[in-house]
Every structure is written in structure tokens, then in C-alpha cells.
From Swiss-Prot:
In larvae, highly expressed in the brain, optic lobes, and ventral ganglia. This is Cytosolic carboxypeptidase Nna1. GO terms for cellular component: centriole; cytoplasm; microtubule cytoskeleton; mitochondrion. Belongs to the peptidase M14 family. Residues 84-94, 506-519 have a biased composition (Acidic residues). InterPro entries: Cytosolic_carboxypeptidase (IPR050821), Pepdidase_M14_N (IPR040626), Peptidase_M14 (IPR000834). The keyword Transmembrane does not apply. Binds 1 zinc ion per subunit. Coiled coil: none annotated.
Length: 1201
């Protein structure tokens, strides 16, 4: 092989790796490491000129224009030595690949490179491996090759690519700062307290929950299961009433369609997973789409509030690289001149501006009479300009808002859409001769349309489509209607003027007027227009009460949904049947008695508003309806289907109407406040099929591979109403979880005393649902309630072994000073009989199964506020309050320094404490070894925080043992490694959707900052003073007692069994809580990424994971009792006391260690004998069975013979 050809191949690979560095493509992860460098065709590559030493290659012309790439090329020419980097205080860590190159020849290597960018889109390599033809196809690196969650880990300027002189392979080097932020020197500035920073997808209530400390005088006993507990199977929300629904919209971004926009500009600094608006979030059906070049989905104005929501959504999904996401610095300033002042005054000014803008727009619409075509065009132009002006004003309000500012309420948003829908009812006679079909750019594919929010009912999206479609079609109808006869036009324009000039308040006043005249005018649309006016007023969720007939008489399940089995009735004369149905519904309403049932329509509206706030450009189906009707030569009022308004038999049944491919279904949803059915008029079969497919893709399509970029922070500004109940009509429990560490997603009322609860999975994941924390209000005393949490994922739990959940009563805390206590009777944890459990073909049945925790509770107070949780909560705010107290303490602050370790993906501070006795003698400080203790890497394991609190209380106290420990050691305490997960209420993962306790081998600092900096801190401590012990605190959900996991030293005879001395001493000091028999010291392959094993591999013998049970103890005097916060804190103190005994150099303590060592040997020998006996017993049992079978077989043979 010619030398020049080898150099050419090396240059091409260098350029490839340099290009892929922006997508976190380090050398060790690159699949091209498996390929032997071989020459390419001269026409395919541009030969790079080798340097004199052959140690670096120049970039080709494709990246010569990029300044960043030029800088990387210059740094690459500096050589392979790590100490030649020009910046002072920085070092390079060489990441050399250890994979062996596969021998063979490469037939073809094609690099398809976009002319406007240096990003590699597709790489296909054909080569031979073990005399076999192989083909390697590498996908789009920029869209996240390294995993399903990471799209931008290592930035471009953090990789330096050189060429190895010996192997001629490109070597990626990661630049790291020499002065690690983990251990700042000579910095005495205090850490300030920070408000929790939420992902922008999450809604946050303005309420800080503070609980009083409380420990029961007598340990609470474990529950005694009888085995006869009731096991109700999940009924599902379709057979109940959704009384709470909150599911944060995921911030993951979906892979791009193959067709890209021509105006999309890409660069090395862009985030491909979140910059593109159409690709980051599926197109929306909820808002009209204003296309580029003046094209519109439908003629008419785009609602100003919809523009505001879209602008908010664009900000929320963009991956901002700025660390300071401050929305509150600028003062609010509009044309009204509001600037400065308090947040309350600004909020009033904002509301006033919105109200004035709305009145002005309505007044202009009332003044302009659309008699002629020019006047109508002027009216539409004025409305469009006014809408754009409002949108800009609202956008300015959003930019300059304050913390007290709340955007427009759902009532304001839905009233706009409700007004558009009522125009659809007025314009009944349609001529489609001049209907302009939508352009090609409007036909956006729905292939990747997925629901951005888990809606409480599948019919919500279809209902939203129906609303938008009717509004979209009506705008076209209003234009075409102007070409009719003059007499008909005058009558139509008169009714149109009356309807458009009346405001929302006037509509509400007119609704209670002559009902007979409304029934007579149904054919012209006036009656239904008034009905829908009242309906749009009710969509606000009961914020304002309006005097409308039947406001509390019918179930909202019946009003919004209707009966699926009866909503598909076909008819030939649609208009006549609609008149008949309307009159029948009027009569049925007048005859039906008033019924008070819980509301569900506001939950539907809330979810629809959430989808509206997140959706963009999803109303494509509404544009296709006009074209289909034109092609078929039919209108809405000529031929179609209608459905009879029927009454739902069960008040708790929540049926859905589905769009069928086989039937002509009406898409103009005309829902009445008084009726319990749904009036539908049809379109063509093609239109129905299109809508069906899009609805299915919106609700049921498979999610493409999601890629996590980075979550914006601050919490959702647009607050939707998660509580659908109307206090006057709903008398059940009120649920809430939009506070710190809360994770309830949905509450469904099956009966007045039975509720099914659904937990939200860890953010950006679909599993990990075990932790729960929620609030209940409006309780009734001496009434037995049953709660069933129906979507848990662990196959076993301590709930089947006597464990109980915890509760906190607000009135109990005030009257009796009670805090968190155990609660619940008839507790049972069992597997659901779902489809995955009954399917024998699925190999992953166990992984896909869900489990239910059910228990009963009887409240002691009326109208109480009660919190329920899996274990005693300990939030990020609780930790900060505690740390600030230490920092402000006059004595503790002298030997306890609070520092900032790093910031998380959401920008939350990760703190660490350095606790040691100050000394002026540097030699004494160097002799001190360090103790590293961390906690809460898993957000749901709150007992770890209580143990850490007990440890910090003891080590900062004034006892003799604490003083001796501070003089002997340097304590490095990281009390909360995963604050992001704690804040949002995750069970196990961080915002990356990954378990941080499996990422201790990571080199990606930006993705796992707390883990990376903790490991860097440990490495530095090992070099400076040494680490005597490392301990990571956790909690366990399947075992009782407290125990330790360690790492055995089989291959080192000198250290064999030494790692077990400290756990045995801890058992001696806390015999009724800590179990040495439960301790394990094995190293499993699945745990190689944990902190315990990674630190042990760094040379730390005493590397432990301490596990505290969520349940209780089975030892000594505490046998059969629950653990409480005092028990966990006691274990933290016992840890410190045992540490001093373990490291004491007193001869008596040394002799004690020798005795303990012998005792450990005896224990392990006994365990081996017992294990051997068990194996022999099993073999004997199997042998006996075989012997019995042989005896039976022989006896049968004898009898036969």
C-alpha cells in the first residue's frame, strides 16, 4: 500500500472525526474504528498535505471557511503531546481507542456531504470481515448517533483531533480545565439560596409546602396483611370521571422527516434536535397555520392569543445555550406606558390592555358591515392588522413579564375559538365553485404527528379538530356566500352583523331569552349560535358563572362526548334532521330534572389548551376539507349524516365518538349546553379518511426515536385548569401534585369514595413509576375512601410485607402537632391483569407489566388538606433551608464551608460541604484523609436525605466524637446529586432520562455534571490527601432493615475481607436497625457504572453503598416496626461514631478489629457450609423425585406384563 494513499485515508478520517465532534463523536465511540485505513479514489477526496513530522493533517476546503474548524486545525498541528496546548490552566486528556482494527480491504466509501455545511449525513462502508462481505451504514450523526437521549453532549470547541504518528489513526482529545470548579481554592464567598428551577414543560403552583418535624412517641408497627385484602382491577378512565389530569409535555425532540426546508440553515453551533420548529414538535391541529409567502390555511385572522401561545412554545422548545434564563429583568412597557411599579400593578395593566384590545376588535367588526366584497375585504384586513398588533403586544408582555404575571386565561383563549365556531353555524348555505384548493406547501405530511401530551380522553384531539375544521371552513364559506343573490345576501349579512357585533356578554344575556324563537330559527343558525355562545362560556372551567339554561343540569361527559354507539346514525336529509334534533333536545331539556354530577369537560378543555399551547401547524386536515368537498361537488348542508342527540345512561361513563372510514361523519361539531348528544354534519368519504388517519397518527402513532437536547427552565407560564370540578356541582375530593417532588398525573373518580390514581413516569421516560406524592382536599370525616395507584412498575414491594404509606394532615398538625405518620388499611400490592400479562407471545411481559397499590383511608377531619407520599418527603428547598442555616450559624460556619459543586441541566445548584477543623499548620492538613459521602442520586430515595441530615447534624455538632472526627478527617458531603429529579418528582432518573448511578464512568461533563464533578473531586482528593472511605446513601423498596453493599477483594490477599470490618462494626453499634447478614460484597457486571464500584476501582477499599429500607426493622427491639425520620437520622450519627472507632489507632481498638476479622471469617465459612447444604438438599430432592418416578414406572410395567 502506497504511503501517499495511507496519508490520504488518514486525512479523510481526520476530517470525518473533526466534523462529527459537534455531535459528541469521540474516537472511542466511532464505528469507523473497526475499519482498516485504506486508500480512496482520488476523485472522492481532496488530498491533505501532511505536516513535516506526519503528526497532523490539514482540513480540506469544505471546512476552511469555518473559523472554529480553523482553530481546531491549528490546535491539531501542535502535535500529540498533551502539554503543548497554548492556554494556561488547561490540560488535555487523551482518549485513545483500545479496539483492534479488523484486517480486510474496503471496497467503497461514500461521503455524502451537504454543500452548505460540513456535517456528515450518511456514511456507508462496504468491507470484508473474516472473508465475509459486510456493509456498515451509519445514520445521521448530527441527529444523535451516540444514544437515544443525547444530541449535543460535547461541544465542537471541546475536542481536539490529532493523528497518531505510529498508527496514523485520528485521536480525539478532550480538553478539561486544570482548575476544577469542584474544589475552588481561596474562595470564601457564600453560596446564596436558589429557587428551584423547573423544566418549562412543568406547571408549578405558587405554594411552598412546609411540614412540621414530628416523630411518634412509640414506633409505628408494620401492617399485618391477612391475605384476604380486596384486589380491585383497574377500571380505567373511560368508566370514570377524570377529576385531575396533569402530564407535563415532554421536552424530547423527534427525528426529522426526510424532506427538509430549503431555508433551514445549519451550522456547527446549532442544535439539530430542537432548532427546527416543525421537526422539534409535531404539527398542531389546534391553531390555524399561517404559511410562508402569504399562504394561509384559511382566509381570516390568526388569533392573537394563539400567536402568543406559539411564541411561548417556540421559546420553550428551543435549546438555549445561555445559562441565565432570566425572564424578569426587563420592565413591562407597552403603548399604554406601563413601566416600573409593582408586579400587581403590571398584571392589572396587562389585563387592561388585553380587555381593551378585545373590545376594540369587536367594535371594529361591528362597525364594518360586509355588504359588498370590498367592504368585507376591508373588514378582514382590519381584523388581520388588529390581530397582528395584539399579537405583538402580547409578545412584548411575555418578554417583559414579572413573576406574578399570568398569561391570558383559558376562558379568553377558548372564547375566541368559540366565537369562530358559532360563525360556522350561521353560514349554512355554501357554494364551493370558487373555493381555492390549498397549495402544495400546505399539505404537510402527518407522518410524524404525535400527541405532545397524554390527553385524558382520546376524543379530545378529535373534538379539537372538529372545532378548528368548522372555523376553517366557515371563513371560506363567508367569502363564497357574497356571490349569491342580493336578497339572500342582505338577509345573510343582517344575521351575520347581528351575531358578530354582539359581544360575549351580550350572548350570555340573550341565551336566557325566548327559547321558542331560538327553536324556530334553528335553520338559520341563530338558535344554535346562542347555544354555542353559552357553551364557549362554560369552557372556561367555571371561572365565571353565566346564567345559561341547564348550566348545572347535565353531565359534561354527556355534553362533550356523547354516546359512541348512538353518534353514528345515518340520515339522508341532514339539515332537516338537525332541526328536528335541536327541537327534540330542547324538549328533552325542558322535561329532564336537574342533576348535579361532577364536571369533566374542563379537564378536557384543560388538556386541549395544553395541547394548544404546545402545538404548531397541526391544522392541515382543516385545509383539506374544502378541496374534498369541491371535488365531490357537495356541500355540508346538502348531503350528509347526522346523529340524534341521546342521553348517556350512566353518569360516570365517558364514551368517545370515533371517526370511521366506512361512514360519512359530520366534522362540524355543534355541541349544545342543554343537550346530551352531539350534532354532526358530514363531508365526503375522502375527507373522513384523511381526518381518521391524521387523528390516529395524532393519538396512536409510534413515537420516533426521541433525542434529549436540553430542557429550558422556569416552569410553565401558561397555567391550565387541572381541576375540572365546579365547587357548586362537584362534592368529591380535589387532587393536586404540581408542587415540588409531586408526581400525580391523573385522578379518576370511579365511585364517590373510590379513586384510581395514575402516576407520572420520570420525565422523558415511559417507566420508573414507583414514587408518589400528592395532595387531597375537601375530605369528609368518618367516610371510608379507597385509593388505587394502578400503574406502578416494580414486581414486588414491601407493601405486601407490612409497609404503609405516609400521610400528613394540615388540621392534625395545627390541632395535635402531628406530622408525617403511617396510614392505610387493607393494603395490597398486586399485578394487573392487563393485556401484556395475558399475552404469552410477548417475551417482555414481565417488563411491560404494571402493578397496583390499593389501600383504604378514613379521614379524621372535614375539609382537611392531606398529603400522601411513598416515604417521608425531603425536597430540594428543604435541603437549601438546612444548608443556609449552617452557613449563617456563627460557630458552624467556621469549620463548615458550603460550596457549589456544579449546576445541573436545569440550572439548579449542586452543593457540597467541606467539614474539618481549621488548622494553620499545612502539614497537619495534609495528613488528614478525606471522607466522601453523597446522597439522593435517585430522587425518590428520601431516607438517604434523612440519613445525610443526621450525619451533617452530628459532624457539625459540639460533641467530643464530632470534634475528634473534624480534627482527623476532611469530610466532603454532597447531600443531593440529582436536584433536577427531586424537583420534578422523578423516581430514579435525571432530566436526561438516565439513571445517574450508572454513569460514573462517563466523560461527558455537560450531560451528567454532578457525577462528572463528584468523580473529579474524588480523583483530586486521592492525589492530594487520600480518601479513607466513600459512601453513597440510598434506600431500598424490597428489603427491611439497613445494610451495606461493598466490593470484595478476592485477588488481594492482604485486603481480603477488610472491606467487611466497618459494616460489622456498624451492626454492633446499631444492632436493632442495621443488618450485617443482609450486606453483600459482590461486584456484578450490571453495577459496573455505579459510584461504589468506580471508586473502588480507583483504589479505595472502603467503598460502600448504604441502603435504608422504606419499610422498617426486623431486628431486636425494633422488630416489626416502621422506620421514621428519627431512625434514619440515628443511622447517620451511628455512621460517624463507627467511623471513629474504625480509624482509631488505640491498641485496644486494634485488638478489637482483629477479633472482628476472625468473626467475619467464621461467618463466611458458615455461610458457605449452609449454601453447600442447600445445594445438596436440592440435588437430593431431585434424586428422590426421579427415584419415585422410576419406582412408579417399574410397577406399571410389572402390572402390564
Amino acid at each position: 500500500m502506497a504511503e501517499r494513499e495511507r496519508e490520504a485515508m488518514s486525512a479523510s478520517l481526520s476530517r470525518l472525526l473533526r466534523t462529527l465532534s459537534s455531535a459528541s463523536m469521540s474516537r472511542r465511540h466511532c464505528p469507523l474504528a473497526l475499519l482498516q485505513p485504506i486508500p480512496l479514489h482520488q476523485s472522492e477526496i481532496a488530498l491533505g498535505s501532511a505536516s513535516s513530522g506526519g503528526s497532523a493533517e490539514r482540513c480540506c476546503s469544505s471546512c476552511s471557511d469555518d473559523s472554529n474548524n480553523n482553530e481546531r486545525c491549528k490546535s491539531a498541528e501542535r502535535g500529540t503531546a498533551a502539554d503543548e496546548v497554548g492556554e494556561e490552566g488547561r490540560e488535555e486528556v487523551e482518549l485513545e481507542s483500545k479496539e483492534d482494527a479488523v484486517e480486510g480491504e474496503q471496497d467503497e466509501l461514500e461521503l455524502k456531504r451537504d454543500s452548505s455545511t460540513v456535517n456528515v449525513n450518511v456514511v456507508r462502508a462496504n468491507f470484508k470481515c473474516n472473508d465475509m462481505e459486510c456493509s456498515l451504514v451509519l445514520g445521521d450523526y448530527v441527529n444523535g448517533f451516540l444514544g437515544s437521549f443525547l444530541s449535543k453532549g460535547l461541544k465542537t470547541n471541546q475536542l481536539v483531533v490529532n493523528t497518531d504518528e505510529k498508527t496514523l489513526r485520528p485521536v480525539a482529545r478532550l480538553k478539561e480545565p486544570r482548575d476544577l470548579f469542584a474544589l475552588p481554592k481561596d474562595k470564601d464567598n457564600d453560596c446564596s439560596q436558589q429557587a428551584p428551577r423547573w423544566p418549562v414543560e412543568c406547571q408549578v403552583i405558587e405554594e411552598r409546602i412546609i411540614h412540621i418535624p414530628y416523630v411518634p412517641a412509640v414506633p409505628e408497627p408494620l401492617n399485618a396483611p391477612t391475605g384476604n385484602e380486596l384486589k380491585p382491577r383497574p377500571v380505567g378512565e373511560e368508566n370514570g370521571i377524570v377529576v385531575f389530569s396533569y402530564s407535563p409535555i415532554s421536552a424530547v425532540n423527534y427525528e426529522k422527516p426526510k424532506a427538509k426546508k430549503e431555508d433551514d440553515e445549519s451550522s456547527d453551533e446549532s442544535d439539530y434536535s430542537s432548532d427546527s420548529r416543525q421537526d422539534s414538535t409535531p404539527p398542531s391541529r389546534s391553531t390555524p397555520m399561517r404559511l410562508a409567502g402569504g399562504g394561509e390555511c384559511a382566509p381570516g385572522k390568526l388569533n392573537s392569543v394563539s400567536k402568543m401561545i406559539n411564541n411561548v412554545d417556540n421559546r420553550s422548545t428551543s435549546a438555549s445555550l445561555d445559562d441565565n434564563d432570566d425572564y424578569y429583568d426587563d420592565e413591562y412597557d407597552t403603548s399604554g406606558g406601563y413601566c416600573g411599579g409593582s408586579g400587581e400593578a403590571k398584571e392589572k395593566a396587562i389585563i387592561k390592555d388585553l380587555i381593551e384590545a378585545k373590545k376594540k376588535r369587536y367594535q371594529e367588526e361591528a362597525e364594518v358591515t360586509p355588504v359588498g366584497g370590498g367592504t368585507a375585504r376591508n373588514s378582514r384586513a382590519a381584523s388581520r392588522s388588529e390581530a397582528s398588533k395584539d399579537a405583538s403586544d402580547i409578545d412584548d408582555i411575555w418578554k417583559n413579564n414579572t413573576s406574578e404575571y399570568k398569561p391570558a386565561s383559558p376562558r379568553y383563549v377558548l372564547s375566541q375559538f368559540g366565537k369562530n365556531v358559532t360563525k360556522a353555524v350561521i353560514d349554512r348555505i355554501v357554494d364551493h365553485e370558487d373555493l381555492v384548493p390549498p397549495s402544495g406547501s400546505q399539505k404537510v405530511s402527518n407522518q410524524f404527528a404525535v400527541g405532545p401530551v397524554k390527553l385524558p380522553k382520546t376524543n379530545i384531539a378529535r373534538l379539537e379538530v372538529a372545532f378548528e375544521r368548522s372555523a376553517c371552513q366557515d371563513r371560506s364559506k363567508s367569502r363564497l356566500k357574497k356571490k349569491m343573490s342580493s336578497s339572500r345576501r342582505r338577509r345573510e349579512s343582517t344575521s351575520d352583523e347581528d351575531s358578530s357585533s354582539s359581544s360575549l356578554g351580550n350572548e350570555e344575556d340573550e341565551e336566557v331569552d325566548d327559547s321558542d324563537s331560538d327553536a324556530e330559527n334553528t335553520g338559520s343558525g341563530i338558535g344554535l349560535r346562542r347555544i354555542l355562545g353559552s357553551y364557549s362560556a362554560r369552557l372556561a372551567g367555571g371561572a365565571e358563572k353565566c346564567p345559561c339554561p341547564g348550566s348545572g343540569s347535565v353531565s359534561d361527559t354527556e355534553t362533550l362526548v356523547g354516546d359512541e354507539s348512538r353518534s353514528r346514525l345515518a340520515g339522508s336529509n341532514g339539515l332537516h334532521q338537525q332541526d328536528v334534533v335541536c327541537s327534540r333536545n330542547r324538549q328533552a331539556q325542558s322535561r329532564s330534572p336537574l342533576r348535579s354530577v361532577p364536571h369533566t369537560h374542563a379537564a378536557t378543555v384543560a388538556a386541549a389548551a395544553a395541547a394548544l399551547a404546545r402545538g404548531r401547524n397541526r391544522d392541515k386536515d382543516g385545509c383539506l376539507g374544502g378541496k374534498d368537498e369541491k371535488n365531490m361537488g357537495m356541500g355540508v348542508g346538502t348531503t350528509g349524516t347526522s346523529s340524534m342527540g341521546t342521553r348517556t345512561s350512566s353518569p360516570v361513563r365517558n364514551n368517545v365518538f370515533r371517526l370511521s372510514k366506512d361512514q360519512h361523519i359530520l366534522l362540524n361539531s355543534m355541541t349544545s349546553q342543554e343537550t346530551t348528544g352531539t350534532l354532526i354534519s358530514s363531508t365526503s368519504t375522502n375527507q373522513t379518511t384523511t381526518t381518521t388517519n391524521s387523528s390516529q397518527s395524532f393519538l396512536c402513532s409510534d413515537l420516533p426515536q426521541a433525542q434529549f437536547s436540553r430542557s429550558a427552565v422556569g416552569g410553565a407560564r401558561f397555567m391550565t385548569n387541572c381541576h375540572p370540578m365546579n365547587p357548586e356541582e362537584y362534592d368529591g375530593l380535589e387532587f393536586e401534585s404540581r408542587f415540588e417532588s409531586g408526581n400525580l398525573a391523573k385522578a379518576v373518580q370511579i365511585t364517590p369514595t373510590y379513586y384510581e390514581l395514575y402516576l407520572r413516569p420520570d420525565l422523558y421516560t415511559s417507566r420508573s413509576k414507583q414514587w408518589f406524592y400528592f395532595r387531597v382536599r375537601r375530605t369528609r370525616r368518618k367516610m371510608l375512601y379507597r385509593f388505587s395507584i394502578v400503574n406502578l412498575v416494580k414486581s414486588d414491594s414491601l407493601y405486601n410485607d407490612g409497609m404503609q404509606p405516609v400521610m400528613y394532615s394540615t388540621l392534625g398538625a395545627k390541632e395535635k402537632s402531628e406530622g408525617w405518620r403511617r396510614c392505610g388499611d387493607n393494603i395490597c400490592y398486586y399485578r394487573n391483569d392487563d393485556e401484556s400479562a395475558s399475552s404469552s407471545a410477548n417475551e417482555d411481559d414481565e417488563d411491560n407489566s404494571t402493578y397496583t397499590l390499593t389501600f383504604t383511608i378514613e379521614f379524621e377531619h372535614d375539609d382537611d388538606t392531606v398529603f400522601f407520599a411513598h416515604s417521608y418527603p425531603y425536597t430540594y428547598s428543604d435541603l437549601q433551608d438546612y444548608l443556609m442555616e449552617i452557613q449563617r450559624h456563627p460557630v458552624k460556619s467556621k469549620f463548615c464551608k458550603l460550596r457549589l459543586l456544579c449546576r445541573t441541566l436545569a440550572g439548579n445548584n449542586v452543593y457540597y460541604l467541606t467539614v474539618t477543623a481549621p488548622s494553620s499548620n499545612e502539614e497537619n492538613m495534609r495528613r488528614k484523609k478525606s471522607i466522601v459521602v453523597s446522597a439522593r442520586v435517585h430522587p425518590s430515595e428520601t431516607p438517604a436525605s434523612w440519613m445525610m441530615k443526621g450525619l451533617m447534624d452530628f459532624i457539625t455538632g459540639d460533641t467530643t466524637v464530632a470534634k475528634r472526627l473534624r480534627h482527623k478527617f476532611i469530610f466532603k458531603l454532597v447531600p443531593m446529586l440529582n436536584p433536577d429529579g427531586v424537583i420534578v418528582g422523578n423516581t430514579r432518573n435525571s432530566l436526561t432520562g438516565k439513571d445517574l448511578n450508572r454513569q460514573y464512568r462517563t466523560v461527558i461533563r455537560e450531560t451528567y455534571p454532578s457525577i462528572w464533578y463528584t468523580k473529579a473531586m474524588i480523583r483530586r482528593l486521592i492525589e492530594e490527601c487520600g480518601v479513607a472511605m466513600y459512601c453513597d446513601m440510598h434506600a431500598h423498596s424490597r428489603k427491611h432493615n439497613i445494610f451495606i453493599y461493598g466490593c470484595e477483594n478476592k485477588r488481594n490477599p492482604e485486603k481480603k475481607l477488610t472491606e467487611q470490618v466497618f459494616p460489622l462494626m456498624l451492626h454492633k453499634n446499631s444492632a436493632d436497625r442495621f443488618s450485617f447478614e443482609s450486606c453483600k460484597f459482590k461486584i456484578q457486571r450490571s453495577k459496573e457504572g455505579t459510584g461504589r464500584i468506580v471508586v473502588w476501582m480507583l483504589g479505595i477499599t472502603n467503598s460502600y453503598t448504604i441502603e435504608a429500607s422504606f419499610g422498617g426493622s426486623s431486628l431486636g427491639s425494633r422488630k416489626g416496626t416502621h422506620f421514621n425520620t428519627q431512625d434514619y437520622e440515628h443511622m447517620g450519627r451511628a455512621f460517624c461514631e463507627t467511623l471513629l472507632d474504625y480509624c482509631d489507632e488505640n491498641p485496644n481498638k486494634v485488638k478489637r478489629h482483629a477479633k472482628l476479622f476472625k468473626q467475619i471469617k467464621k461467618i463466611r465459612k458458615r455461610e458457605k457450609r449452609e449454601q453447600k447444604a442447600l445445594k445438596l438438599q436440592k440435588m437430593a430432592d431431585q434424586g428422590c423425585i426421579m427415584n419415585d418416578k422410576l419406582k412408579v414406572k417399574r410397577s406399571v410395567e410389572k402390572s402390564v406384563s
